[in-house]
Amino acid sequence: MRRLFTSESVTEGHPDKICDQISDAVLDAIFAKDPNARVACETAVTTGLVMVMGEITTNCYVDIPKIARETIKNIGYDRAKYGFDCETCSVMTTIDEQSSDIAMGVDEALESRAGEKIDIDAVGAGDQGMMFGFATNETEEFMPAPIAMAHRLSRRLTEVRKNGTLPYLRPDGKTQVTVEYENDKPVRIDAIVISTQHGPEVSQEQIQADLMEHVIKAVIPAELLDENTKYYINPTGRFVIGGPQGDAGLTGRKIIVDTYGGYGRHGGGAFSGKDPTKVDRSAAYAARWVAKNLVAAGIADKLEVQVAYAIGVAKPVSIIVDTFGTGKISDEEIVNIINKVFDLRPGAIIRDLDLRRPIYRQTAAYGHFGRTDLDLPWENLNKVEEIKKYL
């Protein structure tokens, strides 16, 4: 059976991604000084304006406007003709402390308050909710092919802009890849869409030729492209006005780009700007860690795990898996293995993945999962041999 599946990515200059990167840059700056800080940092951008807001409890000081400007500069918005300038944009901040009602449940989990003997790492979940982790063996990064290819294109767009190969490119951009599957295996790419911001002096014909040569052919395997592959490069015909001048941006608006490109389910919680007591982030990372190690151990060709929490409670309220008919053992047996090999209490996740570190800014563009260019703890295949003992 043949079917098509499509996923998109965006470059670091996309307005929503600017916000994610500022929020995580603030988190990293705080964690560099105070690893036990509580951070929920949200950012909004529009023409000439950055607003950073949220709840932060810490014993250190960081210069948030400076962090925002440096982040914007590193992305590439460093001159007025781009429609957004790190030097001249206004930066407003409005920060409160974390609610004491929330803090009391995170500081001491329900189990601890009830007198259960638990280890010191068992802090309560910072919120209720369900998180999903996914992995598939269809690519070397254990990610679905459509989102993996879309990220390769968006990273390459930024690379050729920053290294001067295509100096007329500007920071904003989006990519999209449609993959054709046969019998659940990716066999070819049916369509590629690239929209990239550019200077007014360049022709559409040059953009199309350059992106085909320096972006698409540079990162997409030739065997996946054929005479029937369709290419849509700047299909509107012009993309000069972009970034925050073209669209307002908000933290947490690219959660599907951040995860599995829609191929796996999503619990709805965003990642950027949140310290790891927020299970929206830490439990989603842990769920990916679980799923990837299970697939690497040969338990299934693809696997999704859902974990759910109650606010102020350490132990998950539920864990369930779906192997989409590819499992070598039953789903119930897989859940039993998860409970034996992994500790999914928030404090244990923070401990085992060493999450109280300034490692988050680098994840805020081009996806949080399948990052072969980064050393991320939730991508480590360090539980495979232990899992195999139970097979």
Curated annotation (Swiss-Prot):
One of its GO terms (biological process) is S-adenosylmethionine biosynthetic process. Pathway: Amino-acid biosynthesis; S-adenosyl-L-methionine biosynthesis; S-adenosyl-L-methionine from L-methionine: step 1/1. ATP binds at H14, D172, G173, K174, R238, F239, D247, R253, K254, A270, K274. L-methionine binds at E55, Q98, D247, K278. Pfam families: S-AdoMet_synt_C (PF02773), S-AdoMet_synt_M (PF02772), S-AdoMet_synt_N (PF00438). It is an enzyme of class 2 (transferase). Its main location: cytoplasm. K(+) binds at E42. Gene3D superfamilies: 3.30.300.10. Residues 98-108 are annotated as: Flexible loop. It is found in: Cytoplasm. Catalyzes the formation of S-adenosylmethionine (AdoMet) from methionine and ATP. The overall synthetic reaction is composed of two sequential steps, AdoMet formation and the subsequent tripolyphosphate hydrolysis which occurs prior to release of AdoMet from the enzyme. This is S-adenosylmethionine synthase.
